[in-house]
Regions:
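Gly/Ser/Thr-rich phosphate-binding loop
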Residues: 265, 288-296, 305-376, 389, ...
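Conserved beta-loop-beta connector loops within the AMP-binding
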Residues: 384-411, 445-446, 508-512, 547
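Structural core segment of the AMP-binding/adenylate-forming
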Residues: 6-11, 37-38, 80-81, 108-182, ...
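Conserved AMP-binding/adenylate-forming core of the ANL superfamily
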Residues: 50-96, 100-104, 121-126, 179-182
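Conserved AMP-binding/adenylation subdomain of ANL enzymes
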Residues: 109, 225-244, 254-292, 307
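AMP-dependent adenylate-forming
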Residues: 37-62, 168
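AMP-binding/adenylate-forming catalytic core of the ANL superfamily
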Residues: 120, 126, 137-141, 294, ...
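Conserved adenylate-forming
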Residues: 78-84, 187-200, 204-246, 258, ...
């Protein structure tokens, strides 16, 4: 804005802000709260349906009106259990209607909804629960055995709620266990959602701990509502009450990429797949519920495409598939678009970006380009959505040109980008107000970003991160192993799998199987490397670090045993 008395030389930002504050607009100061999304859905889209494949088995159908009423009862139940504003309430659950109710009820009372990723190994989950100081844990039936192991080791946990009814409750070893449906039935309903500062913490997700302990990212009501608006835009997910969306991405993965919130905002019909994510189960749900859009990681789509190829089935209603979590292979894009007539939307984000940062849609001019040129664009992660700014910088922090050739550290900022980590002061991931993603990227003149490498050498297998450092540390803990390095090897299904490279100590007698068995005792099964190879030595940089760059080049054509 230019003020009438502006000097010839621009004022410093602080001085300009002081002048701009001299005149305030006359708009109501209504806070952007997550409860307002659900209240809006219940009033405007009351009869829109939400469909869930439940853990118990049957398909469950509800409406936004009923979802709102049950969320109000859950809010009252949480308060009756002693949950207070600011408390963290954890979930271990699949995509289902009770999990959606928990999203809205926990945040709606001013507490923090903390989704736990059950695919992490036990020690990580225990660390996260203890670090977050969760006061309550809500679990699907699937994860009740896991909760029985975790709860006794978390003294701050006041109780566990099983998200089922009494008829489906199995035998268990947890004292004072609460049954979800009984908690709701005991409440009168009609809860009035409180109003509070929109900057209040609303939800908490932890990173996968690829460079050490997992780190907590604490979202706010404001950031969540703004993110919901952004992902609903026509050139992003294009959500409306005319769409039926099935989020395959789990609700424990950065809030299912924000889709449950955005669906309430736009009245989108939501279909939730539960625990069954195989190709046949997903296809049947797509067809039975006439799904028009879906979102998930490449590994899931590989299984779905394989099922379609084997059976000759085709989609009758699916129009768009969002692929994120890791890069979409060109063959996958071609298969969806050429073989099945489904548009592919390539997207990028991370836990720290809520998660959506970019979406890749072709411009009108690109629609006339040759197919190969269009695919070259679609392989990119796309352009930033409104609210997100991107830049790339060199090692000295100098901004690099957006010419599609210069590659540098990708940095991002915006209203739903993390400014720090929960209980972690002095994060070195932020530079002059920008968050460093750890990705090496290019940005072309049209604003399309493409990730070319990952600076921290993590392995992304089926959309899940695996820490090379953690595996290396375990390997060198085996007697007789002098040095170890883990790099990514290409895999046709999982995109990447860990390959373990080992150097024996002089005179040592140790076999690869013993090393892998040792690792398997300490990490989740899917973290265990697919192969271990002994080498005479590992290359090092001038500073004494193992050169992963040289190792990747040396083993770029390596074929894992089960992919021969």
């Amino acid at each position: 804005a230019v003020l009438p008395d502006s000097p010839a030389e621009p004022l410093p930002i602080a001085a300009r802000l002081v002048k701009l504050r001299a005149m305030r607009g006359l708009m109501m100061d209504s806070p952007l709260l997550i409860s307002s999304l659900l209240r809006h859905a219940a009033r405007v889209y009351a009869d829109q349906t939400l469909v869930s494949r439940t853990v118990e088995g049957p398909i469950h159908r509800t409406s936004y009106r009923e979802l709102h009423e049950r969320s109000q009862r859950l809010a009252q139940a949480l308060l009756a259990l002693g949950v207070r504003p600011g408390d963290r309430v954890a979930t271990l659950a699949w995509n289902g209607y009770r999990h959606v109710e928990t999203y809205f009820a926990v945040s709606g009372i001013g507490a923090v909804c903390h989704t736990l990723n059950p695919r992490l190994f036990f020690d990580q989950l225990l660390y996260i629960l203890q670090h977050a100081e969760d006061v309550l844990l809500l679990v699907d039936l699937t994860f009740l055995p896991l909760a029985e192991k975790l709860a006794p080791r978390c003294p701050g946990l006041r109780g566990v709620v099983v998200m089922t009814d009494r008829a489906h409750l199995p035998e268990h070893a947890l004292p004072g266990l609460h049954v979800y449906e009984e908690l709701l039935a005991a409440q009168p309903g009609g809860y009035a959602w409180p109003s509070f500062d929109e900057h209040t913490a609303s939800s908490l997700c932890y990173t996968s701990g690829t460079t050490g302990d997992p780190k907590g990212v604490l979202y706010t009501h404001r950031s969540t509502v703004l993110h919901s608006f952004a992902i609903s835009l026509p050139d992003v997910f294009s959500l409306s009450e005319r769409e039926t969306v099935l989020p395959v991405v789990p609700m424990f993965h950065v809030n299912a990429w924000g889709l449950p919130y955005a669906a309430a905002l736009t009245g989108t019909r939501l279909v939730l797949p539960g625990a069954r994510l195989d190709g046949e189960s997903l296809y049947r749900l797509f067809e039975d519920e006439r799904v028009t859009m879906t979102a998930g990681v490449p590994t899931v789509w590989m299984g779905l495409l394989a099922y379609l190829k084997q059976t000759g089935q085709r989609f009758t209603t699916l129009k768009r598939v969002v692929i994120g979590g890791s890069a979409a292979p060109e063959a996958m894009i071609r298969a969806f678009q050429d073989d099945y007539g489904v548009e592919v939307l390539h997207a990028w984000g991370m836990t720290e970006t809520s998660p959506l940062g970019t979406a890749c849609r072709l411009t009108p001019a690109m629609q006339t380009w040759p197919e190969d040129q269009q695919l070259a664009v679609q392989r990119k992660q796309g352009r930033p959505v409104f609210g997100v700014e991107l830049r790339i910088v060199d090692d000295e922090g100098r901004e690099l040109p957006h010419d599609g050739a210069a590659a540098g550290d990708l940095q991002v900022r915006g209203p739903w980008i993390a400014s720090g980590y929960y209980k972690l002061d002095g994060s070195n991931a932020h530079h002059d107000g920008w968050f460093s993603t750890g990705d090496v990227s290019t940005i072309d003149p049209l604003g399309y970003m493409q990730i070319t490498d990952r600076s921290k050498d993590v392995i992304k297998s089926g959309g899940e991160w695996i820490s090379s450092i953690a595996l290396e540390n375990l390997a060198v803990g085996v007697p007789g192993i002098a040095e170890a390095a883990v790099i990514a090897a290409a895999h046709p299904k999982w995109t990447e799998r860990p390959l373990l490279l080992l150097v024996k100590a002089p005179g040592a007698e140790v076999d690869a199987r013993a090393v892998l068995d040792h690792i398997a005792q300490h990490v989740a099964r899917w973290w265990v490397p697919d192969a271990a190879v002994f080498v005479d030595g590992l290359p090092h940089t001038a500073t004494g670090k193992i050169s992963k760059l040289q190792l990747r080049e040396r083993f770029k054509d390596y074929r894992l045993p089960d992919t021969e």
